[in-house]
Regions:
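Bacterial signal peptide processing site
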Residues: 17-20
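Blade/loop signatures of beta-propeller domains
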Residues: 47-112, 264-271, 432-451, 515, ...
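Repeat-blade elements of multi-bladed beta-propeller folds
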Residues: 83-87, 125-146, 171-196, 221-245, ...
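Extracytoplasmic beta-rich repeat domains
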Residues: 115-130, 160-182, 210-225, 242, ...
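C-terminal capping alpha-helices of c-type cytochrome domains
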Residues: 191, 711, 722-745
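Blade-level signature of beta-propeller repeat domains, shared across WD40, Kelch, NHL, RCC1
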Residues: 591-641
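Electrostatic cytochrome c docking/interface patches
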Residues: 642-673
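Gly/Gly-Pro-rich "capping" loops immediately C-terminal to redox-active cysteine motifs
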Residues: 671, 680-717, 721-724
Length: 745
């Protein structure tokens, strides 16, 4: 049954927020606050043509309670029965005091239910969502931005919301994804890739309001889960690779009106503007997005988050200075957005080593005194541990001299945290012999080694260190758990004739980066002592670690693996104590919750574009009383799915979604298919991607047979497309790639 409803839109105009960048007016400390006049002028219109905007499908009556306007106490308590925020509570610690599942009995954990969502299986989508659970109902979002309400006890679908994203949307940098939703005040809050913030009716999935946060045509998108707190919905924006001006903003949860917006790039005359060239317009195009869910300390009245890289990512030649507030942990007044403090992890970033991992708040006794801490795991491979009251390091961080490049305008020093790095930070001669091709003869370096016209291969890479997959803190072990990536990336600056200029809505990278051909990618699962920043134990994987971590009172951590496994480790010593193989890459963080005294573990296993993993659409939920030891044990009829899709349709759905309506072998058709399946890794027009080589320079670019073979079967971290694209589509992509050859005009 389809239910079409009228949409209630809240449109807003805020001076200096939505105008053309040329008209942006400097605001004190980059902060803009709504006044009464702004609120009075907010336009409200109904009767939007929702035939072009969204669809809701109701499968059964809503069985649970309606979420209240949660108090600060409710949102700060460690999650037990419910999982109320993306990070479990306002502190983002992903720790649960539920302890019925322990190291002693976790081997008995079995599959309780599986639900197929029927969405987000095309390769361009990534399943990175953390489910929310409130009073027996789970809320999850797919990479296609479709939201489902699910009976958390049985897995039965309650409703689905299916937005129609903006036609022509092509400014998504790093895979189409969403990392979750928020719940509060009877609403489910959703950030969409076309930069809309939407409030859904918790019982029906119908739209109550939506706000166009910014213009996707300029590169603004929303990939993070919003945060509900104190009657407000907080969200940042992604898009640093497109030269946006990053910010964090708060919206009225009842109507969607903007309350405040604080920019992460200071306008001329604002605090921090001295870290940009005086004649630079970098404050309008310099990036510093906020693409992870923030944390809040209600006692201090402070909201915390990390900011992204500068733009252009890899070219510092025209932005001399530290480029605040990029690559920083920031603290703002949660009510007003006013600046409190910042700590910059990378000065003048030219490596795309921005702090992508969500910040985690914790309280711990140090030197006989309880301290309010904040930890952020960086792409650098270090964890930065600060006092969240002042922003000063709780454990020492030293400014040390680093190699210099006059052309890149590098910073003379960089912060070096005291403690252990959780991934290697240099490429050694032994690494070259062990891991790299025999014909490799390039320059090698370490973290903070600059580059210019000649390629330099370094560690860590733009994948990390720690990337977006959330870390966790367990107050019982006093350990911080983090996933790390260890791979080889080469950087080189464009030649003068290829010098990249800013063009609105186009990628603004500034140089070339790519993984070293035929080199291994590895991952780490690491436990660090929060008081010393020293490694307690570490597990090494033969693939990148790209999911997230849950830790519990049962002395366990749970995480997902690229091969589809969800794995449990002993939180104290790292011993593997349980695993279960799903049917797709387990590339999202697990959660836990309790209903009627039974503890559940749940994960969205749907694959990931940048990890190159198999795609799917299922949520897997486990308990000690579960019935199934493997996916093969569960009868197909017992897998929950949208009623209109039978199992045969579900098996075909991934293929159907991935196939172009146009078909054929034309270059234009190939370009469309490329955008949907290849752009995130290889970049626009085959260059500037996040996990793939520059195709324009590839030796096979003019060899159609070799291209078709590569697309069909994949290699290294590239997955095969023979099962998701037709012969005609593969041929079309090959023809498009051949058109990119530098030998053609």
């Amino acid at each position: 049954m389809k239910r079409w409803v009228m949409i209630f839109i809240v449109l807003f105009m805020v001076s200096g927020c939505q105008d053309n960048p040329d008209k942006d007016e400097p605001a004190e400390n980059g902060n803009q606050t709504e006044n009464n006049e702004n609120n009075a002028n907010t336009e409200q219109t109904g009767n939007k043509d929702n035939d072009k905007n969204y669809e809701t499908v109701q499968f059964k009556e809503y069985p649970g309670k309606i979420a209240p306007e949660f108090s600060a106490k409710e949102l700060t308590e460690p999650p037990s029965g419910n999982w109320l925020t993306n990070g479990g509570n306002l502190h983002n610690g992903r720790y649960s005091p539920l302890g019925k599942i322990t190291t002693e009995n976790v081997a008995d954990l079995k599959l309780e239910w599986v639900t197929s969502l029927g969405s987000g299986m095309e390769f361009k989508y990534s399943g990175e969502s953390t489910p929310i659970v409130y009073e027996g109902v789970m809320f999850n979002i797919t990479g296609a931005n479709e939201v489902s309400a699910i009976d958390a006890k049985t897995g039965e679908l309650i409703w689905q919301y299916k937005p129609k994203l903006a036609e022509g949307l092509d400014t998504v940098c790093c895979g189409w994804t969403s990392r979750g939703v928020a719940v509060g005040d009877g609403k489910v809050f959703v950030g969409l890739l076309d930069a809309r913030l939407v409030a859904l009716d918790q019982k029906t999935g119908e739209v109550l309001w939506e706000t166009q946060v910014d213009e996707w045509e300029k590169g603004y998108t929303i990939t993070s889960a919003p945060l509900y707190y104190n009657g407000k919905v907080y969200t940042g924006v992604a898009g640093g690779e497109f030269g946006i001006r990053g910010y964090m903003a708060a919206y009225d949860a009842k109507l969607g009106r903007q309350i405040w917006r604080t920019y992460t790039l200071p306008a001329p005359g604002d605090r921090g503007s001295e870290t940009w060239p005086k004649d630079s317009r970098g404050w309008l195009t310099g990036g510093a997005p906020v693409w992870q869910t923030p944390a809040v300390d209600p006692e201090l009245g402070t909201i915390y988050f990390a900011t992204g890289n500068t733009a252009p990512d890899l070219d510092g030649s025209n932005r001399k200075g530290n480029n605040l507030y990029s690559d920083s942990v920031m603290a703002l007044d949660a009510d007003t957005g006013e600046y409190k403090w910042h700590f910059q992890e990378i000065h003048h970033d030219i490596w795309d080593l921005d702090p992508a991992n969500p910040v985690v708040l914790f309280d711990v006794k140090m030197d006989g005194k309880m301290r309010k801490g904040i930890a952020q795991a960086g792409k650098t491979g270090w964890v930065y541990i600060l006092d969240r009251t002042t922003g000063e390091p709780l454990i020492g961080i030293e400014e040390k001299p680093v190699p210099q490049s006059e052309k890149q305008k590098t910073s003379p020093t960089q912060p070096f945290p005291i403690g252990d790095a959780f991934v290697p930070q240099t490429v050694t001669k032994e690494d070259v012999k062990k891991d790299l091709p025999k014909d490799f003869n390039g320059k090698i370096g370490s973290i903070f080694t600059p580059f210019w016209d000649k390629p330099v291969t370094v560690k860590p890479s733009p994948q990390g260190g720690a990337n977006w997959p959330p870390s966790a803190y367990n107050p019982n072990t006093e350990m911080f758990y983090v996933l790390g990536n260890d791979n080889y990336f080469a950087y080189a600056h464009y030649g003068e004739e290829e010098q990249e200029k800013f063009e609105q809505g186009k990628e603004y990278i500034g140089s070339v980066w790519q993984p070293v051909k035929d080199s291994p990618s590895r991952g780490t699962v690491t436990a660090l002592d929060i008081k010393t920043n020293k490694i307690v134990w570490q597990k090494n994987w033969d693939t990148i670690a790209y999911s997230g971590i849950l830790t519990t009172k049962g002395n366990l951590i749970f995480t997902g693996h690229n091969d589809g496994r969800i794995i449990a480790y002993n939180a104290t010593n790292g011993k593997k104590v349980w695993e279960f193989k799903t049917d797709a890459g387990a590339n999202a963080p697990p959660i836990t919750y309790e209903i009627d005294g039974k503890q559940y573990i749940s994960i969205f296993s749907a694959g990931n574009t940048l990890a190159g993993t198999k795609h799917g659409d299922k949520i897997y939920t486990f308990s000690l009383e579960g019935e199934y030891s493997s996916l093969e044990d569960i009868p197909r009829d017992d897998i929950n799915a949208p009623p209109e899709k039978n199992e045969e349709n579900k098996e075909k759905h991934g293929d159907d979604e991935a196939k172009s309506e146009n078909g054929g072998g034309t270059v234009s058709t190939g370009a469309d298919i490329y955008k949907g399946n290849c752009l995130a890794c290889h970049g626009a027009e085959g260059a500037g991607g996040h996990n793939g080589p520059n195709l324009q320079d590839s030796k096979m670019i003019n060899d159609k047979k070799a291209l078709i073979e590569q697309i069909k079967n994949g290699s290294g971290t590239m997955p095969p497309f023979k099962d998701t694209l037709t012969e005609e589509e593969i041929n079309a992509v090959a023809e498009y790639l051949m058109s990119l050859s530098k030998g053609e005009e």
